[in-house]
Amino acid sequence: MWILVSWLALVARLVAGTQCPDGQFCPVACCLDQGGANYSCCNPLLDTWPIITSRRLDGSCQIRDHCPDGYSCLLTVSGTSSCCPFSEGVSCDDGQHCCPRGFHCSADGKSCSQISDSLLGAVQCPGSQFECPDSATCCIMIDGSWGCCPMPQASCCEDRVHCCPHGASCDLVHTRCISPTGTHPLLKKFPAQRTNRAVASFSVVCPDAKTQCPDDSTCCELPTGKYGCCPMPNAICCSDHLHCCPQDTVCDLIQSKCISKDYTTDLMTKLPGYPVNEVKCDLEVSCPDGYTCCRLNTGAWGCCPFTKAVCCEDHIHCCPAGFQCHTETGTCELGVLQVPWMKKVTASLSLPDPQILKNDVPCDDFSSCPSNNTCCRLSSGDWGCCPMPEAVCCLDHQHCCPQGFKCMDEGYCQKGDRMVAGLEKMPVRQTTLLQHGDIGCDQHTSCPVGQTCCPSLKGSWACCQLPHAVCCEDRQHCCPAGYTCNVKARTCEKDAGSVQPSMDLTFGSKVGNVECGAGHFCHDNQSCCKDSQGGWACCPYVKGVCCRDGRHCCPIGFHCSAKGTKCLRKKTPRWDILLRDPAPRPLL
């Protein structure tokens, strides 16, 4: 039975807090422990939740056997492991205390509150994905998620941050709750707990907008160029693209350790990312799950990081649902509440890219590996793909190692004193001629394969003669992918690097609009090039530059690299050579 201390003092000093007889300070009230010897912080407004004092973590450990009997070995938020004086403990967010299993740590980590199944989950929030403790009220938070007001049948304030007791109204101007009995300070909501029936939340969207990671994790690039998940927030991604370290540490790849001033821990291996559940903007473009499609000032789609967001008229920013865009202050407003508005990010293609095989790594004339892979022979004699560029193919014909490593026995890779696990090769895909089809701008218009739909001055669509191009804001010009439009200088600019991949040639057909010779033709918006066999092939650029290897070509204004796999910029490209077709072609 919990004995409440100084209830009258609690009511009078709800905001100021309460000092317990033993000298400790509690934000709401003090409760005498069951033994009657010690005090703990409690909150009578949340009914009478059992609260006990937490214990300090003591001693480092790797496994439970390193701790005394009755202790557990816990991973802390700092990435270290320490012994907890509970047989089944839970690490607190302060990294210094722990609580028994079945208890939740307080914000300062000094007390533990028991939230058993009989208490937690009594209040189900709409959708049955989140729940609040008994005698609490579900309220929407500012980010659209569910929060809990620590009072039964509470009034949720329209700022989505605060709440008031039942029967009271929110006075956000004076930050008070108004009731017939007087005024009270506004109460602040806390996040709702995900129910046991709810699926794990994946709120961390990676920069490629195609991969997502679980809550409290960090996106890190893998050797394949894709993204994986480091299982802790704000982690440090190591340069080997295989490991990661806790925040405020340094990757020591030679010793395979994470180093900080206070401690050393082992490197962590990244986990694969998860595909994003996409929100379709149109037939070709999509945004990550939980985002909203909004038009950018270029006419292209952008993604706002809110569900059911409000797209601002400047075509750059967006606001949470229910808010209004205030362009003068650069804020989102809801009543007296103001929050900074968010900037949209470019949406990504959601349908298979017609150029998907263009960047493949060719193994021979019939087989290829994805971009940033290496062709390696399998034990069958066929080609396999190692999921990293310029990799070392191991003699067992099963594994491969990163560049600079040596293949060791049992599938390991070694570089100096460092050992990592080898990667298994994947099957190649057979190279086939792409089906030629137009790129749809909308339901009524399209552009040829290898070009990009851009909005025109007339409000309709026009075609840029480059794939995945950047549409300039003047709606008359476009630039290659990776460049920005400089409207005043009338140039396409790139801060660093002036390289783009070259394009593979396709076989010339017997019919077409551009005559090559010897009865061979290429389609409109293509160029004729001699292939490696001396015949004719088609380059998907207008006035394209044919590479010496007879397999690739580059846009006008570029020249081919020595191997023909890259296009090097001669000088800053002027956009007067990148004019688009006056009108797109209708879909058939």
UniProtKB/Swiss-Prot annotation:
Offer a single GO CC term for the protein. Answer: vesicle
Report whether Lyase shows up as a keyword of the record: no
Keywords, A to Z, come to:
Cytokine, Disulfide bond, Glycoprotein, Lysosome, Repeat, Secreted, Signal
Q: Which residues are glycosylated?
A: N38, N372, N525
Question: SMART domains of this UniProt entry?
Answer: GRAN
* Signal peptide per UniProt: 1-17
Pfam name, any one: Granulin
SUPFAM superfamilies reported for this sequence:
Granulin repeat
A GO biological process of this protein is: positive regulation of endothelial cell migration
Q: Under the GO molecular function aspect, what terms does this record hold? A: cytokine activity; protein-folding chaperone binding
Q: Which family does it belong to?
A: Belongs to the granulin family.
Assembly and binders: Progranulin is secreted as a homodimer. Interacts with SLPI; interaction protects progranulin from proteolysis. Interacts (via region corresponding to granulin-7 peptide) with CTSD; stabilizes CTSD and increases its proteolytic activity. Interacts (via region corresponding to granulin-7 peptide) with SORT1; this interaction mediates endocytosis and lysosome delivery of progranulin; interaction occurs at the neuronal cell surface in a stressed nervous system. Interacts with PSAP; facilitates lysosomal delivery of progranulin from the extracellular space and the biosynthetic pathway.
Q: What biological function has been recorded for the protein in this entry?
A: Secreted protein that acts as a key regulator of lysosomal function and as a growth factor involved in inflammation, wound healing and cell proliferation. Regulates protein trafficking to lysosomes, and also the activity of lysosomal enzymes. Also facilitates the acidification of lysosomes, causing degradation of mature CTSD by CTSB. In addition, functions as a wound-related growth factor that acts directly on dermal fibroblasts and endothelial cells to promote division, migration and the formation of capillary-like tubule structures.
Q: What protein am I looking at?
A: Progranulin
Gene symbol of the encoding locus = Grn
